[in-house]
Amino acid sequence: MNVHAATAMPQGEQSMDAPMYAQARDLMVDDQLRPSEITDSRILDLMRHLPREHCVRPDLHNAAYADTSLPLTPGRVLPQPLLTARLVQAAKPSAGQHVLVVGAATGYTAALFARLGLRVTALESDIELIQTGKAFCAAHAPSVVWKQGPLSQGDAESAPYDLIYFDGCIAALPAFCAAQLTGHGRIVGLLQTGHSLPEAFSAVREPGYSKPFRVTPLFEAQAPLLPSMAPESSFSF
């Protein structure tokens, strides 16, 4: 199903109007993000204004600001607002940096980075998600550059990146990260190994470290694995 295809509302339910969506965004920020140690005022301000409802199917518009992930296409979701805010804050974004958003889906996080002043390459493998993401970013973050391709390969054409951001869960760190990240770059995402819960992480290169990256575990979270992220195409860290 096309994410942006028209879908009838359940009988008796109507979509909220623009002021109600604005109120829902304020409640999301004040009730979900601020009490959960989201302290970056830039992120809080942008999430008060980016219309997250445009990143999901019309029948899910009214749930766009709920504290839950929302289905997009089979196996893909729009992460819950708090998870996105926590990961973006952990990425320590700085204006002028170049970020690769892997699994950019319908473009919400890519647009968030672009509005923070970063140069954004959005990598997605699903053409339906790309269509929605391009439309969303054209309206709200037109500088985002979209690429279609396997997520496990990154995008060497636009490398190097100061930040590689996985907008979903991976089973291991893909090998492309070592080749496409700058010498002082950072990687942020969710990692699931074995039967454990996925865990958010931040990884950086450090001279003299015995492995390619020094990894800092952040917090446990829930998200499905991104496509084509098989452990055999990656390395341990």
What do the PLM-derived regions correspond to, one by one?
Residues P227-F237:
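Short, surface-exposed secondary-structure junctions/capping segments
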Residues P58-L60, A200-S202, A230:
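Short aromatic-enriched loop/helix-cap "lid" or pocket-rim segments at secondary-structure transitions
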Residues N2-V102, Y108-L112, L116, L129-A138, ...:
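Class I SAM-dependent transferase core
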Residues Y65, Y108, Y161, Y165, ...:
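Aromatic side chains
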Residues K92-R214:
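Conserved nucleotide-cofactor-binding alpha/beta core module
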